[in-house]
Swiss-Prot record:
The J domain is necessary and sufficient to stimulate DnaK ATPase activity. Zinc center 1 plays an important role in the autonomous, DnaK-independent chaperone activity of DnaJ. Zinc center 2 is essential for interaction with DnaK and for DnaJ activity. The lineage of its organism: Bacteria, Bacillati, Mycoplasmatota, Mollicutes, Acholeplasmatales. Coiled coil: none annotated. HAMAP family: DnaJ (MF_01152). This is Chaperone protein DnaJ.
Length: 369
């Protein structure tokens, strides 16, 4: 099967800028990452997106592709990606792919932005429907305070890489059916940094990064529900060499309530009433998420009838619209009657006999006519 055009894979035009290419890749990589997507062919699509990005994000490879198509990139026009993608890690791994792993110095520089982090938070039902504030502690990585991310013990220990001369990449010539073609690869000596280090920082052991904790008061909006995700800007991993931090994404799990249930932004409550209340009607106090309110039970109500309390639901966090509370009436049949109660029901049954007979006749008519 012929390979798809890389521009079509990313959904961009041939005149797309580097920022537009990166934005399209990031969106599609999030959508099709196997750890996130439930689509059956997510892994195949993810590899296809990764392959397209690897070519279009490299100026030399992009130029060859624009001239010669898939053959110009060293890829089989009818096969899979030449190098493959290997295994898949967690979601943090794909976030790092959004900014890292490029083949040029310009691409390497964009990797300075901190990675996004993801966490799950369990909250109570009432916290979810009314909103709350949670103090969150996040484990992050950030630039070492001693070496400021360089990985060197001092500035004197940093030297321009002798292999790539500070470019972070080297040129590699390959023979193809169209002749010798030149591509760029990350410098193996400096790993794309453009510099080498004599003495490593004693604090971070040359990594340039250290572990740390961040705390933040997260305002949970009223109306959040299971699997909803909240973005907290700037509380992901710290950026490299002064770049901005990534973001924190919190996905919620809401504990069930003893009496309340949810249907979107509406609250559902089952309320038991007696035969007497159902027949004669009544006024009863009903709990809502905002406190008790008085509810009128109309005379003659049937079991399963749903009564509405306007604007007594939770808010929709996206629109701000408030839902309603739906009260479902359940008529309880009395058990273990006293002798006096039995006599009263027998008297009621005698008074109700003509109506009961009429109803039974109507019921039988459905089968006899």
């Amino acid at each position: 099967m012929a390979k798809r055009d890389y521009y079509d894979v990313l959904g961009i035009s041939k005149s797309a800028s580097q920022d537009e290419i990166k934005k399209a890749y990031r969106s599609l990589a999030k959508k099709y990452h196997p750890d996130v997507s439930k689509e059956k062919d997510a892994e195949t699509k993810f590899k296809e997106v990764q392959e397209a990005y690897d070519v279009l994000n490299d100026s030399n490879k992009k130029a060859q592709y624009d001239r010669f198509g898939h053959a110009g990139t060293g890829q089989d026009p009818f096969g899979g990606a030449g190098g493959g993608f290997g295994g898949f890690g967690g979601f943090d791994d794909i976030i790092s792919q959004f900014f890292g792993g490029g083949q040029t110095r310009r691409t390497r520089q964009t990797s300075n932005v901190g990675e996004d982090l993801n966490m799950r938070m369990t909250i109570d039902f009432m916290e979810a429907v009314l909103g709350t504030t949670k103090n969150v502690s996040v484990d992050i990585t950030q630039d070492c305070g001693h070496c400021h991310g360089s990985g060197a013990e001092s500035s004197k220990d940093v030297h321009t890489c002798s292999k790539c001369h500070g470019q972070g990449f080297i040129n590699v010539d390959q023979r193809t059916m169209f002749g010798t073609m030149r591509s760029q690869q990350v410098c193996p000596q400096c790993q794309g940094e453009g510099q080498t280090i004599d003495n490593k920082c004693h604090v971070c052991s040359g990594a340039g990064r250290v572990k740390a904790k961040k705390t933040v008061d997260v305002k949970v909006p009223a109306g959040v529900d299971n699997e909803m995700t909240l973005r907290v800007p700037g509380y992901g991993n710290g950026g490299r060499k002064g770049a901005e931090s990534g973001d924190l994404y919190i996905t919620f799990r809401v504990k069930p309530h003893k009496i309340f249930k949810r249907r979107g932004s509406d609250i559902i409550l089952d309320v038991p009433i007696t035969f007497t209340q159902a027949a004669l009607g009544d006024k009863i106090d009903i709990p809502t998420i905002y406190g008790e309110v008085e509810l009128t039970i109309p005379a003659g109500i049937q079991s399963g009838t749903e009564l509405k309390l306007k604007n007594k639901g939770t808010k929709d966090p996206r629109t701000g619209k408030t839902g309603d509370q739906h009260v479902i009436v359940n008529i309880e049949t009395p058990k273990n009657l006293s002798s006096e109660e039995k006599k009263l029901f027998e008297q009621l049954s005698k008074l109700d006999s003509p109506r009961k007979k009429s109803g039974w006749d109507k019921f039988k008519s459905f089968f006899t006519n």
